[in-house]
Amino acid sequence: MADFDAVLKFWGPVEADYTSHGGLVLTRLFKEHPETQKLFPKFTGIAQADMAGNAAISAHGATVLKKLGELLKAKGNHAAILKPMANSHATKHKIPINNFKLISEIIVKVMQEKAGMDAGGQQALRNVMAAVIADLEANYKELGFSG
């Protein structure tokens, strides 16, 4: 519970502008881990130089961060939020679990840079994301997806 509270202390700036923060998260994910861009068919034709400020990337990034906000505010009681997300990401999008670990680290960096998240907050976010990803992976296994 303390980890969720530690992260939520820094969530305000992100919540105030999901679109720009989300665009930054996905753009950085695609630049640092180019293989992840292939998992998003609607973004495969976008050149790296054109990613920053791309409306579609920013919109999807906002969706990602809004969902993360829901998970954070649930403070661990997130089964009802996570199950449909696990279902779509396993059965429809086929997103390997490792990609959630990659984006988690990008989110930590963006939170540090843009929301002033300190070392304690960064560790708390890593702890929260590890717990969420473990639960996501358990859902994947139930669905028979070994991503």
Curated annotation (Swiss-Prot):
Residues annotated for heme b binding in this entry: H89
Ion transport recorded as keyword: no
Protein origin, superkingdom: Eukaryota
Keywords: Cytoplasm, Heme, Iron, Metal-binding, Muscle protein, Oxidoreductase, Oxygen transport, Transport
Positions in coiled-coil regions: none
Cellular component, GO annotation: extracellular exosome; sarcoplasm
Domain annotation Globin: ranges: 2-141
EC number: 1.7.-.-, 1.11.1.-
Any single biological process term in GO: removal of superoxide radicals
Keyword Oxidoreductase carried by entry: yes
A Pfam match: Globin
Binding site for nitrite: H60
Annotated positions binding O2: H60
UniProt function note: Monomeric heme protein which primary function is to store oxygen and facilitate its diffusion within muscle tissues. Reversibly binds oxygen through a pentacoordinated heme iron and enables its timely and efficient release as needed during periods of heightened demand. Depending on the oxidative conditions of tissues and cells, and in addition to its ability to bind oxygen, it also has a nitrite reductase activity whereby it regulates the production of bioactive nitric oxide.
PANTHER family linked: MYOGLOBIN (PTHR47132:SF1)
Designated name of the protein: Myoglobin
Originating organism: Sarda chiliensis
Gene, per the UniProt record: mb
